[in-house]
Amino acid sequence: MKKIKKLFCICIMLTFVASCAKPTISFTNDEIELINKYSQQKMRVLIYNNENDSLILRQQTKEFSNTDLQSDIFENLKIQMLLTVQDTSNAGVGIAAPQVGISRRLIAVQRFDKVDEPFEFYANAYIVYYSDEKRIGSEGCLSIPNLRGNVERSETIVVKYIDTETLKPLTDTVSGFTSVIFQHEVDHLDGILYIDKLHPDV
C-alpha cells in the first residue's frame, strides 16, 4: 500500500512539473539558423526555377504554435520579411514566409484598402470564402522575377488568421486589389504559384 501511495505521489509531482514547464517553440534548428543568419536584414528571396528553392516553394507549409508567435525568433522573421518585401531594388506588395525559405503559414500584405496602406502580418492564414464574382488581372511575384501573367481571382474573400499580437483567431472580409494580394500570398502557403493559374483566354 505504501508503495502504491509513493508511486501515486511521484506521478502527481511529475504531472505538476510537466504542466509548469516552459512551452518550447516548434521552429526547427534549420529555421532558427536561417532567421538568425540575416539578423534583422533583408533575406534572400527563393526563385522558382532554382531546383533547391523550388522544393521549398512547392511545399505545404506548417502552422505556428502560440509559443512560436510570442518568440523573438518570430519577431525577427517578421522584421526581416518586411525589410525584404520593401527593398527598394525589388519592392513587392506582399510576401509569404516560404519565399524566404521558412515553410510556415505567415504572410505580409500591403493593405491598399486602409489608411496609409500599411503592411500587415497574418499568421496561420487560410481563405475560407471566395466570391463567385471574379476579376482577371496581371500578377507578378518576387520569386518569379521579370515575368507577369494574367490570373483570374475572386473579387471578395474572407481570410481566417491568428492575430500575432493578441493570439486571437480573427476573420477579415477583403475586396478588390487587396483581396488579390491575399489570394496570391495564401497560395504560396499551399505550394501554389501564380503561374499555375494563368488564364488561358488572355
What are these language model-derived features?
Residues 13-19:
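Hydrophobic h-region of N-terminal signal peptides that target proteins for export
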Residues 1-8:
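Bacterial N-terminal signal peptides that target proteins for export
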Residues 20-202:
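Positively charged
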Residues 10-13, 112:
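Enrichment for repetitive, rod-forming helical segments
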